[in-house]
């Protein structure tokens, strides 16, 4: 796995040696970012189930200002930190080892707001709608913020109150829906 484009392009990333995580493939990541827009002009990124940190690092590589990368696994957070070091710009990233709910509370208490959020949780279908609702209720999303929800091919994500679906892709065995805050 590697960074595909932007200032960190072609840098290889470490991945987790675990069956519990399924990193987003370079092909899916490339298609996803191509559909969002190749490059960005600032903004804040949140990845609540960061795994290796690849999506948040890719977003910063392509022009976002900073990313908060969250994972409950200590092993995942070690991998994320090693990948962040590869950027040589560690100050643009924050790694939180905690649950999604704890991260939301911490970030709300700090008054953080995000422009791009990645959601690829285990047990995706049940959790994504709840988390999107919490992000909205806790005022963590800027106006027109994008939420990228990734599931496997068998899960169907519904419409979510407060959001519009702006993109819906099936990329191999991966489904990706992009929601925009209303």
Task: Put a short name on every predicted segment.
Residues 1-182:
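Class I S-adenosyl-L-methionine-dependent methyltransferase catalytic core
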């Amino acid at each position: 796995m590697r960074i595909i484009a932007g200032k960190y392009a072609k840098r290889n990333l470490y991945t987790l040696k675990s069956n519990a995580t399924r990193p987003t493939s370079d092909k899916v990541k490339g298609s996803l970012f191509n559909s969002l827009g190749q490059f960005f002009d600032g903004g804040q990124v949140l990845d609540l189930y960061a795994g290796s940190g690849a999506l948040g690092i890719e977003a910063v590589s392509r022009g976002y200002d900073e990313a908060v990368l969250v994972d409950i696994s200590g092993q995942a957070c070690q991998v994320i930190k090693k990948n962040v070091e590869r950027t040589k710009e560690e100050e643009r990233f924050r790694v939180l080892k905690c649950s999604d709910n704890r991260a939301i509370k911490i970030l709300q208490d700090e008054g953080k707001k995000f422009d791009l959020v990645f959601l690829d949780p285990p047990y995706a279908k049940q959790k994504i709608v709840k988390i999107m609702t919490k992000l909205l209720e806790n005022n963590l999303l800027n106006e027109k913020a994008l939420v990228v929800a990734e599931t496997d091919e068998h899960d169907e994500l519904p419409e979510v109150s407060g959001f519009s679906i702006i993109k819906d892709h099936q990329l191999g065995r991966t489904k990706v829906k992009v929601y925009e805050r209303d």
